[in-house]
């Protein structure tokens, strides 16, 4: 599970340590990488490269095997005071054979950054399906964006994970309600928000 420093994370002392790195000097970029592996039988995989320069984060995500012609929400998940992990099927607490976003959250954590194509990138845009990339007709997403990350995220980037969402579970070529409603927003189908892949973020060379 998400390696939370449960007692310490809420204490002033440990929180100060976690955010003491916030004053990162500009001009000294560091490269991070995430290998995205499939969840929920999606077959979706990919790579993410993140270049951090202070709080500026330039991200490239190249994925394949996603549901064609459908939007795919994608985020940095996690907490500065924790180490994110990608869930296994053991996270399926309701035994329906799927890991929904809520079931995965104890492993990878809450939304920290929304990788939208334009506009806001905060957690408030976590379900802005009209601003997330749409996969090509062959199920690829090639995403590039430079944004300003929250200081706590930028300073502790290696504690976080990237998750892409959206799986056509019944294979009809679109997101529908055949698998029920989203656990995040009942106005959306579960297919639109269920995790498709996940990868922990690591500094290049580690």
Which residues are covered by each model-predicted region?
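Bacterial N-terminal signal peptides
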Residues: 3-13
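Short hydrophobic alpha-helical membrane-anchoring segments
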Residues: 12-20
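N-terminal leader/targeting pre-sequences
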Residues: 19-206
């Amino acid at each position: 599970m998400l390696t939370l420093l449960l007692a310490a994370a809420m204490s002033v002392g440990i929180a100060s340590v976690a955010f003491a790195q916030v004053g990162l000097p500009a001009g000294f970029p560091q490269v991070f990488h995430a290998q995205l592996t499939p969840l929920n039988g999606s077959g979706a995989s990919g790579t993410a490269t993140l270049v951090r320069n202070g709080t500026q984060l330039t991200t490239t995500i190249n994925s394949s095997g996603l549901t064609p012609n459908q939007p795919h929400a994608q985020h940095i998940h996690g907490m500065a005071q924790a180490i994110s992990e990608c869930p296994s099927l053991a996270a399926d607490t309701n035994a329906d054979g799927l890991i929904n976003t809520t079931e995965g959250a104890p492993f990878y954590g809450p939304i920290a950054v929304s990788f939208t194509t334009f506009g806001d990138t905060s957690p408030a845009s976590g379900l802005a399906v009209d601003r997330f990339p749409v996969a090509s007709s062959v199920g690829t997403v090639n995403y590039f964006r430079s944004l300003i990350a929250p200081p706590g995220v930028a300073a502790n980037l290696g504690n976080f994970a990237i998750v892409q969402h959206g799986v056509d579970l019944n294979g009809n070529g679109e997101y529908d309600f055949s698998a029920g409603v989203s656990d995040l927003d009942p106005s959306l189908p579960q297919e639109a928000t269920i995790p498709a892949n996940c990868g922990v973020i690591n500094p290049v060379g580690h």
